[in-house]
Amino acid sequence: MYHLGVPTSRSLSVVSTGEKVYREKVHEGAVLARVMSSHIRVGTFEYVSNFLDVAILQGFTNYVIKRHYPELAKNANPPLALLKTVMNKQIDLVINWLRIGFIHGVMNTDNMSITGETFDYGPCAFMNNYHPDTVFSSIDVQGRYAFGQQPGIVQWNLVCLAEALIPLIDKDADKAVKMAQEVINSFPAIYKEKWWQMNGIKLGFTSVAENEKQLIEDLLTWMQNNQADYTNTYLAIANYYQQTDEKYITPDFAQWYQRWEDILKANNISLSSALKTMQQHNPEFIPRNHLVEKSLDNACLQQNFTLFNELLKTSKAPYQAQSSYKHLQTPPPDGDKGYKTFCGT
């Protein structure tokens, strides 16, 4: 995730415990230590607000601002400014997840950092075939944390943060609620604007107007209807004239591609410039779920680290084309249908 350009915690160490862990099958137990700029979550604010007094909540909030957002201390209303700042951090984070096809899998308030970093890599996975309802987590039977539901869950979690901060935003509870609500109500417009920008950049555009928006929507619809791989579709666009995959050698895709070229020309964007932008924002490689599983089985059961090392190498340079590792771009034949992740994943 770090090399994909996504704010994230980082792995520090793995220590074997010698114990057995029972998930979908029996695993060898281990403890993974991760580091990040803060382990304070929305859930931390909920705990302090619900179980401790207002003075402690005020001191805790002051500490968070001093440590992570000192510029907010001079704001007329630091707690409200903190809510706005965390909201923007979280919008940027989920936009990055959507850009690369990442599904977190368990987005409760204890798994939402106030610094906008990805952490708690439990039942997470990367999407192959594009569909907004894609779910991999074995415990997410209702699809609450599906790929396309993630922005809504972020907003829900921000509501929880706002509720925790109400006593500090204003002594008048009704006034505080109204002020917090105004911040939360701004979420959809801010998110949607950044979502359009992200999707535009993935296609090489510098700005997004109505023509670009329709083109983006049509591409996503085409991917969904044709069960096209999310990552590889953008690579297919960038390498259209060298394309050998039959899925992208069809009249309907050719028609869409021609519209894309026409809109680029109308915006005075050269094909080479667009492709350069696309290369910087569309990964060549993602950690394909079936390959990750296979690499772990090979390493743990057979002491064969070949695939593991290949995945490690490409994950450190995910935006660089590496012809010798083309096989790592291949999605599973069934698009990961039936694949499930667990808390130990």
Language-model-derived ranges and their functions:
Residues K20-H104, I114-T221:
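ATP-dependent phospho-/nucleotidyl transfer catalytic cores
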Residues D110:
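Conserved protein-kinase catalytic-loop position immediately C-terminal to the HRD catalytic Asp
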